């Protein structure tokens, strides 16, 4: 009896965890009602993994939707495992892999519609022995480049539940954490379901950024080539040192009101795609020497998140994000800070810098941009609410991330433009003089500003509409 209870309790824990992942995927519309699948290795029985049933509704999983399957291939239970169970089984045999997720993220799938004759987002690698085209997607943003790196994209004669998928996808995921089936969607593997979700979320963020950059007239192929030729450690000015998701993160804060304040912002940023899950950061200054810091700015509902007290003075092992928070608190009167991957705002910042200073600013880091009070780049809103609240948003190039001195122009941008600065190719840094709410408002506003600008730009180019500049505040 006790043994049966342990087995039942273990299966229930697995179900709740997979249910949480499925709900998180549905929140960002990464699947239709019944598409995609996810699996997880049984942490107790090494011969068993669990997978969502064929035809199950990923955003509303019930216990019967989680099907246990032996690695030997014999399954049991009331429901039938996903049609891609064999693919999951082979991927889960890779050392260190405990979970696989396949989802139909819109932007991650959209970038896959390239051909060997025309590439908008991908680098053509060649064809295999069966003349199937193979490509590589390389993120051009700092977070994507370091979190996931290059992602292989394969074309398939039958891209759903086929024997060629069973053969090639596990092979691709033996070499990388992600792969994309052209026209179908990405697969991710992870040491946990949470980590697999993190990789998919970052891929979607980087894909969205790449699409908006391309639609703004920026040749991302040149940027991708430069990154791959130089290597990311030479191309980018800093290493963000992004770590894996900790399934049981450390939380030092017990105050329910503080926890709820952070949770609301984290959940909102994830749902609205203002940040990729597990990236970014947010904090609140509680004294001249201390702050409460969260090493994420986007987390799905019902997920745990890290929260700790830390000193405002620099420490040797500080991450890039943490150093930025400390730099801001040391040199401004701001009392809250949020860093969000913000794909649209980050892309718009890159496009504006390229338009004003040439493509070199995105390629070689040799272009020097002035950051004088009377001469510096900005992003100008065109929508009424943003113009009323903040008629300019600060903008800097990514090289400023290497400067941790009081002369960093990010600080002046936050002073001059009501606590909002876009770091092109990295993130939006938003702050508040009093509450975390103010920083959250700035982050959300920056993403909407970029969306309006991009859509009007597309209307101008495709529909002969008025130019963006017509609506910019004078």
PLM regions: where:
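Glycine-rich flexible loops
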Residues: 1-474
């Amino acid at each position: 009896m006790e043994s049966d209870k342990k087995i039942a309790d273990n299966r229930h824990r697995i179900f709740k965890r997979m249910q949480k992942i499925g709900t998180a995927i549905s929140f960002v519309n990464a699947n239709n009602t019944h598409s995609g699948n996810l699996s997880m290795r049984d942490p107790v029985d090494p011969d068993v993994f669990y997978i969502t049933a064929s035809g199950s509704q990923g955003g509303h999983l019930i216990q019967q939707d989680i099907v246990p399957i032996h690695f030997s291939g014999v399954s049991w239970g009331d429901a039938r495992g996903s049609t891609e169970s064999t693919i999951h089984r082979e991927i889960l045999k890779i050392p260190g892999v405990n979970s696989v997720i396949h989802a139909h993220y819109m932007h991650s799938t959209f970038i896959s519609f390239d051909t060997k004759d025309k590439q908008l987002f991908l680098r053509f690698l060649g064809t295999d022995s069966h003349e199937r085209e193979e490509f590589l997607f390389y993120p051009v943003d700092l977070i994507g480049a370091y979190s996931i790196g290059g992602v292989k994209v394969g074309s398939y004669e039958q891209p759903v539940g086929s024997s060629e998928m069973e053969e090639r996808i596990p092979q691709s995921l033996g070499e990388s954490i992600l792969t994309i089936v052209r026209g179908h969607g990405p697969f991710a593997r992870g040491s946990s379901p949470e980590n697999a979700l993190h990789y998919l979320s970052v891929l979607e963020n980087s894909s969205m950024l790449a699409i908006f950059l391309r639609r703004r007239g920026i040749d991302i192929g040149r940027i991708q080539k430069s990154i791959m030729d130089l290597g990311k450690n030479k191309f980018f000015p800093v290493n963000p040192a992004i770590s894996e998701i900790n399934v049981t993160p450390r939380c030092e804060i017990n105050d329910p009101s503080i926890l709820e304040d952070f949770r609301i912002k984290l959940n909102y940023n994830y749902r609205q795609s203002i940040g990729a899950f597990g990236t970014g950061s947010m904090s609140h200054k509680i004294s001249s020497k201390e702050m409460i810091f969260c090493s994420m700015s986007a987390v799905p509902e019902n997920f745990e998140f890290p929260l700790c007290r830390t000193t405002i003075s620099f420490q040797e092992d500080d991450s890039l994000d943490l150093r930025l928070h400390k730099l801001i608190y040391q040199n401004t009167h701001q009392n809250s800070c949020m860093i969000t991957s913000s794909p649209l705002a980050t892309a718009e910042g890159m496009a504006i810098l390229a338009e004003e200073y040439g493509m070199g600013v995105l390629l070689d880091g040799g272009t020097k941009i002035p950051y004088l009070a009377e001469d510096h780049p900005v992003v100008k809103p065109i929508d009424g609410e943003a113009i009323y609240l903040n008629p300019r948003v600060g903008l800097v190039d990514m090289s400023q991330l290497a400067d941790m001195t009081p002369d960093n122009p990010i600080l002046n941008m936050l002073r001059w433009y009501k606590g909002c600065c876009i770091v092109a190719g990295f993130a939006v840094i938003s702050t508040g003089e009093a509450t975390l709410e103010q920083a959250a408002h700035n982050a959300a506003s920056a993403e909407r500003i970029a969306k309006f600008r991009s859509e009007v730009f597309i209307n101008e180019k495709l529909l002969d509409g008025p130019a963006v500049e017509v609506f910019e505040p004078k």
